[in-house]
């Protein structure tokens, strides 16, 4: 049976309608793909708690989590990912990537110019509507 991973992603939007996107480093699984920052949900954590913890750990800032945007399951062949994405705002600090190779603020209308990981694409498509 394939490994199943339940993860969350933050669609962090600023006042200019730009969304914070992170590029996975060459050492990570799914190297060099872009994604909405986030990570795995730990045991006894809600998706919202996991998102706040992951963003603080990996990007050194605090967020407020808003409404759910998408809930996608994607089979990568060797493992299956369930990704829940939520709107979010930064409430304290500025994001600094500790694990990703690159980050950028991208206008909603330009999201499709980045090479997103397949599990993130349904959320990207919803944001482009």
Where are these regions (language model features)?
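Conserved Nudix-box catalytic region and its N-terminal flanking loop in Nudix hydrolases
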Residues: 18-57
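Short secondary-structure junctions
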Residues: 58-65
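Conserved N-terminal beta-strand and adjoining loop/helix that marks the start
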Residues: 1-19, 40
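NUDIX/MutT-family hydrolases
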Residues: 87, 96-127
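Hydrophobic packing within well-folded, soluble alpha/beta domains
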Residues: 47, 51-55, 68, 86, ...
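Active-site-adjacent beta-strand/loop module that shapes the phosphate/pyrophosphate-binding cleft
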Residues: 5, 14, 62, 72-94, ...
């Amino acid at each position: 049976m394939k490994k199943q991973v339940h993860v969350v992603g933050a669609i962090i939007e600023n006042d200019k309608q730009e969304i914070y996107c992170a590029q996975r480093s060459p050492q990570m699984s799914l190297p060099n793909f872009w994604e909405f920052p986030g990570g795995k949900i730990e045991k006894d954590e809600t998706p919202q708690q996991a998102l706040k913890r992951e963003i603080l750990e990996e990007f050194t800032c605090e967020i407020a989590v808003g409404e759910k945007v998408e809930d996608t399951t994607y089979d990568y062949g060797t493992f299956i990912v369930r990704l829940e994405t939520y709107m979010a705002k930064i409430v304290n600090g500025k994001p600094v990537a500790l694990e990703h190779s690159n980050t950028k603020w991208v206008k909603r209308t330009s999201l499709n110019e980045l090479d997103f990981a397949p599990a993130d694409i349904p959320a990207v498509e919803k944001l482009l509507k």
